[in-house]
Regions:
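A generic structural motif
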Residues: 4-8
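C-terminal catalytic lobe of FAD-dependent flavoproteins
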Residues: 20, 29-87, 93-179
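Core beta-strand elements of the Rossmann-like FAD/NAD(P) dinucleotide-binding domain
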Residues: 10-20
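Glycine-rich, N-terminal phosphate-binding loop of Rossmann-like dinucleotide-binding domains
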Residues: 25-26
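A conserved short coil-to-beta-strand element within the FAD-binding core of flavoproteins
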Residues: 1
């Protein structure tokens, strides 16, 4: 029938009637569904943090993106020309502490610089970084029992769940396709 909402500024609560309510809240999807931690079960979402670094365009003096399919830890690395700059990414770090404005961990920046140094003629340095940004991927936990928290092996496919009360939850997918 709808949802009970609260105005963040006034704290006033009220009901909004709707024929369908869609939960597309990313890494917070389980929380909105009222999911509570239960021993022996997995939460709906396994949040994963992805970090990108921005450099001057001279790091990648081409109009083409470059993709390295295997880094030292069997992940991938890419460099993309973008808006006159070069983007290098990405990381895949499991997160439980979900901040509305996440920041890169020092180890993630170090990882990207170390891996990029293996592929670029002039290795980028920390002082070359123009900006960083972080995305939180709402990866859907695999249903197989005993699965670990290795987020790099979790599917990036989207999932749609429809509860008996009509709440439709859309989650999963790649951070790069979230819009």
């Amino acid at each position: 029938e709808g949802v009970r909402v609260q105005d963040a500024e006034s704290a006033h609560e009220f009901v909004v009637r709707a024929g369908c309510v869609i939960n597309a809240t990313g890494v917070w999807a389980g929380k909105l569904m009222g999911e509570k931690p239960v021993a022996g079960t997995k939460p709906l979402v396994a949040p994963s943090q992805g970090v990108h670094l921005s450099f001057e365009r001279r790091l990648l003096p081409t109009d083409s993106a470059v993709f390295w399919p295997k880094t030292s830890d069997a992940r991938v690395l890419f460099a993309i020309p973008w808006l006159g700059k070069t983007i290098v990414g990405t990381t895949d770090t499991p997160r439980k502490d979900l901040h509305e404005e996440p920041r890169p961990l020092a180890g993630e920046v170090d990882y990207l610089l170390r891996e990029a140094a293996n592929f670029f003629a002039v290795p980028p340095k920390r002082e070359d970084i123009l900006s960083t940004w972080v995305g939180l991927r709402p990866l859907v936990n695999p249903q197989a029992a005993g699965g670990g928290q290795d987020t790099k092996s979790i599917s990036r496919e989207h999932t749609v769940l429809v509860r008996p009360d009509g709440l439709v939850t859309v989650t999963g997918g790649k951070w790069t396709t979230y819009r």
